[in-house]
Regions:
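Structural preference for solvent-exposed beta-strand-turn elements
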Residues: 1-376
Length: 376
């Protein structure tokens, strides 16, 4: 194999594929990146039996070939190379990377032991890359981090015709985002549970493309597979077993109080007040006509109080939240104004965004957050 490729193109492609390399590969060859040169293109692939990634870039191919080298080492080398064209060639059990006056010789891994990557499933539909990335980020934030509860570490993707709904929960909050897309079949209907971290990493990586193709195969669980493709990059991941709890009935539709606050001063106030909130202690919010009073700490220890302008419709209400979960939600709505809707101080509150304080709420994204019960 002998090829020539631009340094920036090489570094970006290698970094993207190497991101999904396993920290503890189940077999030594799975720590490798597979490089394949043919027909004026150079492809890079990685696979750990769960997630596969592949990207193809234009290259001057002098000699076709395939080689398997240490992925992390190649990524480190590519990052450090000067901004000059890069030549990669193979000779027996060694691969050579030359860039300007830099020359690296790498030992190769046995290509014949590398597993075949799964085939990309048939395309189910397409969505703009920025919409997909935004939706994935808004929902993944509420997914669980506890691997002993694998179902809660996933994002549920539900497809019904031209609507896609993403949902996740860690039992303390529930995030749901809807968006429109272009299905291959107008009557498409499917449900899949995708690892949240994989979904988020993939969505971020595919924002550079105009559109992202989603492709589903299998039963939708366990042995099922989902694929994403865009901007010359494709990745597949096995689906998680199980499904999230039925959540639509958890979201209230009638409220006793609705408060609207400008997001930026609200976020800054929560951050300041939370400085005195010890680990796992809540921030208390008291809504009255025209004002929100935030408090944390106790009279026996450090204490903080702050007032923020707020518009309140309905009854006055006092409620407490985990400040991290509240800030996550305020970050995710990505709107100038935040709307908090309440039934009672002991029931979950619904957070959504508004383009302005006096505008209607955006129902495309909803963040349900459990309150913290206050002693006494």
């Amino acid at each position: 194999m002998k090829i020539r490729v631009e340094r920036d193109v090489l570094a970006e492609a290698v970094a993207w594929v190497a991101r999904s390399l396993p920290a503890r590969p189940p077999a030594p060859v799975l720590a490798g990146l597979l490089l394949k040169a043919e027909d004026g293109a150079l492809s890079f692939s990685s696979f750990d039996y769960e997630v596969s990634a592949r990207v193809s870039v234009d290259a001057e191919v002098e000699e076709d070939g395939t080689v398997l080298v240490s992925g992390r080492l190649l990524a480190d080398i590519c990052r450090a190379l000067p901004n000059r064209p890069v030549e990669i060639s193979t000779d027996g059990v060694r691969a050579t990377v030359v860039c300007g006056s830099s020359r690296f010789t790498l030992h190769t891994l046995p290509v014949e032991e590398y597993p075949a990557l799964p085939q990309m499933p048939t395309a189910t539909g397409t969505v703009p890359g920025e919409v997909f990335a935004s939706a994935a980020a808004q929902v993944a934030i509420a997914a669980g981090r506890d691997d002993t509860l694998p179902v809660l570490t996933g994002v549920r993707i539900e497809i019904e015709g031209d609507t896609v709904t993403l949902a996740s929960t860690d039992r303390y909050r529930f995030a749901v985002r809807e968006f429109l897309w272009k299905p291959e079949d107008p009557d498409a209907s499917a449900v899949a549970l995708v690892p949240a971290k994989t979904l988020l990493d993939t969505a971020k990586a595919l924002t550079s493309g105009d559109t992202v193709t989603l492709a589903l195969s299998g039963s939708g669980a366990g042995e099922g597979l989902i694929g994403f493709e865009g901007a010359g990059r494709r990745t597949t991941t096995r689906l998680l077993e199980g499904d999230l709890p039925k959540y639509r009935t958890l979201f209230p539709t009638e409220f006793n109080s609705v408060a609207v606050i400008e997001t930026a001063p609200f976020v800054e106030a929560v951050k300041r007040v939370a400085l005195v909130a010890e680990r796992n202690t809540p921030v208390r919010l008291s809504f009255e006509q025209g004002v929100l009073i935030l408090e944390a700490g106790s009279s026996d220890d450090a204490q903080a109080v702050e007032r923020v302008d707020a518009v309140l419709e309905g009854d006055d209400i006092s409620i407490a939240f985990n400040p991290t979960f509240l800030l996550d939600g305020l970050s995710a709505i990505d709107s100038p104004a935040a709307q908090l809707s309440f039934t009672t101080s002991t029931k979950p509150a619904l957070l959504s965004g508004r383009p302005a304080v006096d505008a209607e709420a955006d129902d495309a994204y909803k963040y349900l957050i459990m309150p913290v019960r206050l002693s006494g």
